[in-house]
Amino acid sequence: MLDLPSSTPFGNLCLKYMKILQTMSYINEKLVLIFLEDINIRTNRSFINSSYLISIDEVVFLLRRITDEIIALLWLLSQWIKSGQCPTKLSIDCIGSALNNKEILSNYLLDYEKFLDDLNHISNAQKHSFINSDLNLIGYDEPVINALRLDRNNLKNFDIQNWEKNHYSISVRYLIKTFNALFNDMKMNIEHLNSQLKIDSKR
């Protein structure tokens, strides 16, 4: 467990980080069920259980939330070191704002820009796209995340002849593998920033 600042305007950062780890543990439990159900569907050629697709959506939602929280934590610590005091506003608090910030993108997230962009679009499509619920697709040979994007729910933004441009399809295995790499890198960055913050506070 990281010994992060326990008293900040945003609460106990150590507890926030612990909640992230607890959520990751829950995601792992859901993933086991998803892959077991996927095997059952293919082995027994059974109908797709609605809970199977909903569970995949839930994993995406939680991974998005964790990623947003890690980005916010990273930015908070970096700004604390830069200004000498804990910020009272999180200007960078999610994937979208991080992707639009050259500093945090180049310093911490550049290797994961494509992954973050995909996760951002997929989670937004699941949350906002009115046509996304029409999708009832599964992967050819493994669990796959599918999302159908419709910007602002305006059909003028959807070309039926080239619908693939609005369709996202990535394997759950790829999502988890890339997220794990991202999390490990972010954890090291947070550890480094936290150590620097402790050194600065003793001066």
Map each language-model feature to its residues.
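Acidic, Ser/Thr/Gly/Pro-rich intrinsically disordered interaction regions
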Residues: 1-57, 61, 71-203
